[in-house]
Regions:
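C-terminal catalytic "cap/lid" subdomain
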Residues: 1-136
Length: 136
């Protein structure tokens, strides 16, 4: 990954895939495993000392009251606001919460960082502050 970055390449990684195996005796056997993509993405971003962590998902923005009549999309959140909303249970435990947790862990590990959550289609707009949810 560092080699690709040093060659000015955009690296898209930590998307899961692969077949987990474990050694049993002299054989490799399939193993049940889940790769938490959001967590791994955040860890990689910390390891390479990235300035921005972008998490791509199927919604353009993080929302409060998601799926309800009073749903409120957020274009920006502070770390403190994200923590507060997480404590209030605003984020689905198997959908948005892991993304928020990964973003918060990344942001707290360095200075002058931001995390962006959006869709692949809006990624370029999000980098330019015109789409998605930015957490700083």
């Amino acid at each position: 990954i560092r080699t690709l970055m040093d060659a000015d390449q955009i690296v898209i990684s930590c998307g899961g895939g692969g077949i987990p195996v474990m050694e049993q005796g002299c054989e490799l056997r399939g193993a049940s495993a889940v790769i938490e993509k959001d967590l791994v993405s955040g860890l990689l971003a910390k390891e390479i000392d990235a300035d921005v962590l972008m998490i791509l998902t199927d919604v353009e923005q993080v929302s409060l009251n998601y799926g309800k009549a009073d749903e409120a999309p957020l274009s920006h959140m502070s770390v403190e606001e994200a923590e507060k909303y997480a404590e209030e249970g605003q984020f689905g435990t198997s959908s948005m919460l892991p993304k928020i947790d990964a973003a918060l862990s990344f942001l707290k590990a360095g200075k002058n960082r931001s995390a962006i959550i959006t869709t692949m289609a809006k990624a370029e707009d999000a980098v330019n502050g015109k789409a998605g949810t930015t957490i700083e």
